[in-house]
Design a protein with these regions (language model features):
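Perimembrane helix-loop junctions in membrane proteins
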Residues: 32, 36, 64-68, 142-147
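N-terminal signal-anchor transmembrane alpha-helix
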Residues: 1-52
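Juxtamembrane "helix-exit" motif on the non-cytosolic side of transmembrane helices
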Residues: 26-37, 92-105
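Pore-lining and gate-forming transmembrane alpha-helices of multi-pass membrane transport proteins
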Residues: 44-47, 77-82, 115-127
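Alpha-helical transmembrane segments of polytopic integral membrane proteins
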Residues: 23-27, 55-59, 130, 134-138
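Loop-to-transmembrane helix junctions at the membrane interface
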Residues: 57-95
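Juxtamembrane/transmembrane-helix boundary motifs in multi-pass membrane proteins
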Residues: 4, 8, 39, 43, ...
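Alpha-helical membrane-associated segments of multi-pass integral membrane proteins
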Residues: 102-148
Length: 148
């Protein structure tokens, strides 16, 4: 089963973020349209829904491509992805005016203020979550489609 190796890697990679973003979209739609919660998240949800699954798929293709030469665990490979996505996402959000840096913290959507002391934990939590998703979900899907 060595045919279409990279296509199988791409498809195994897009499953986790696609399912997660579908749940996020469903919760948002229920809150926004059913409960009439004023949440302006529709301005920013389209971009991640288009980009994130593709990034995960391409990152998994890179993992499969590098595996014969660079033997890293898939969890570690996935934990490296936030180091690329976080600066890109922060730059995009701040250039669109969705995130503002203040003297004492960061202001999201002109509604949610997070002090710098709490922001220390965000990268650690993000890296840990990516590690677990890649180790247990993407790794299992890679094994399921015969990639390892």
């Amino acid at each position: 089963m060595n045919q279409h190796r990279y296509l199988r890697a791409y498809m195994a990679g897009i499953v986790a973020p696609t399912l997660f973003l579908l749940v996020v979209l469903a919760v948002f739609c229920i809150a926004r349209f059913g409960l009439k919660v004023p949440a302006p998240i529709e301005q920013v949800i389209v971009f991640p829904m288009a980009i994130m699954p593709n990034v995960f798929g391409l990152w998994n293709i890179l993992y499969v491509k590098l595996q014969p030469h660079w033997h890293t665990p898939i969890g570690l490979h996935g934990a490296l992805l936030p180091f690329i996505l976080a600066p890109f996402g922060f730059f995009t959000a701040s250039s669109l005016g969705l995130v503002k840096i203040t003297n004492g913290g960061v202001l999201y959507f002109n509604a949610l203020y997070v002090p710098y002391g709490l922001l220390v934990f965000v990268p650690l939590i993000g890296i840990a979550l990516y590690y677990l998703v890649w180790k247990y979900i993407v790794g299992s899907l890679n094994a399921l489609v015969g990639l390892k």
